[in-house]
Amino acid sequence: MRAFRLASGVLRNRKVILGIGAGSLITAGNIKIRNDSKFDAFFAKGFPDELQHRSLFSVLRSAFVYEICSRAWLVKLSLGAMSLCDVFHLSFLYNPFCRYTFYKHFCGGETPQAVMATMDTLQAAGITSCLNYSREVDLDGDMDVNKIASQGVVPPQVPVPSEKNQKVLRQIADKAFESNMHIIDMATYKPGTVCAVKLTPFINPLVLQRYNSILNQYPVESACNYLEHLKSPELSTYEVSELKKFWEYADKLCQFAKEKQIPLFIDAEQTYFQDCMHAVTVDLMRKYNKEVAIVHNTYQLYLKKSRKIMDDHIKKCVAEGWLMGAKLVRGAYLNSEPRFLIHDTKAETDKDFDSAVEAIIAAAAKFAPGDPASASDPIASRKGKWGIMVASHNKKTMFESVNLAETKKVDFTKTSFYLAQLLGMADDITYALAYSQRNQQPNFCIVKYVSCGPISEVLPYLVRRARENIDALDRCKEERAYYRQALRRRIF
């Protein structure tokens, strides 16, 4: 297997966190972790035991990371410092620091060997890996879709880029395709491993945005036909060519995943891409989810229309005879989306999310063909089953998901059920879930999203995660408390 190519850490218009000394790790005030109820007792188990088996250096590093992440002012200051370094092309000042702190904590490794070691560690704790090549691409000038989207302008037709820009786009697409193929191949190292893939590097983003605007004109019921709508007279010859190449890249990835029997979870995108992502993913599910759920779509329930879209896709899979694959999340682009598209309150988002989880579980129990022979070992077989992933760092969501499993509302002969968090985040949740299945036959998979690749390519991903979580200070403080207590136990 070919190793990832290491690259230099130049980062433009994207910043990651710089920090301060770790002197406050042990001496700061003690934040108690409550365990005075069934709910709190559930999450008090697992992670404290896990920390006891980690090296002192590993605990110190993680504690240092969370000391920074739990202070919004420090995160913002660090982002500013990174921006200043980038202006003067001084990224080498922060790259080594980031490699041995944030990258080590949040990412699986730069080489296949390092990623496999991470997979081994997780598997030993009863946790499945979801491998993810986490490169995020920024394009300059006329191809900067963020700039175009912020202006609210979609051109009547996307002009054919210069030969130079077309070459850049092809290089980006080919590199992303090659890296995702390696990730899928690497997933075969551990049985049960799954992959997450980001499809947007495969196409000129302006073409994707324009096709998204065309699909958005159709009712939900007819919008999710990616190949059918390529016949639209609104599309130019160049746009159709780009959209067909986009399909070819995605199709080849899914074909390879099917050959390797690796489930793929297609990443969600900003709303100016998302209708197109729904359409292409549904067409891929139609093709590849006949016997086993290989392709999984992502539904962001903080968007008002996502529940209706998910319900429509369920109806289609039942009517057309393919298996549903779904990942349910609240959402990842809250700070960059048009506000009117998002639920007015978090309570409304939570209500939509919880009802969507219950609805798709009930639909799987009713409509999925299933595999009755898998009753004694549900994880061993995915034949005839819907794939459902609940991805959240919300303790209440995870607790209720476990209750659904324990009260038999999840039919494990008809559902491959995944509960997922990001590597390095919400470890108290992940290890509590793993603890709940210790010493028994597991019915569902506990998953960590393992981002991997050269640090220079993964750094923008870390930056986006930092920005997304600036407002989630309570969660960071709660995780910080575990590391403080672990250090106190070892040192005092």
From Swiss-Prot:
Annotated protein name in UniProt: Probable proline dehydrogenase, mitochondrial
Gene3D superfamilies: 3.20.20.220
Domain of life: Eukaryota
Molecular function via GO: FAD binding; proline dehydrogenase activity
Annotated keywords: FAD, Flavoprotein, Mitochondrion, Oxidoreductase, Proline metabolism, Transit peptide
Pfam annotation, one family: Pro_dh
UniProt-listed GO biological process terms: proline catabolic process to glutamate
Required cofactor(s): FAD
Cellular component aspect of the GO annotation: mitochondrial matrix; mitochondrion
Catalytic activity: L-proline + a quinone = (S)-1-pyrroline-5-carboxylate + a quinol + H(+)
Keyword Nucleotide-binding annotated: no
Enzyme Commission number, as recorded: 1.5.5.2
Organism, as annotated: Schizosaccharomyces pombe (strain 972 / ATCC 24843)
InterPro entries for the chain: FAD-linked_oxidoreductase-like, Proline_DH_dom, Proline_oxidase
Similarity annotation: Belongs to the proline oxidase family.
Free-text function comment from the UniProt entry: Converts proline to delta-1-pyrroline-5-carboxylate.
Localisation per UniProt entry: Mitochondrion
Organism placement in taxonomy: Eukaryota, Fungi, Dikarya, Ascomycota, Taphrinomycotina
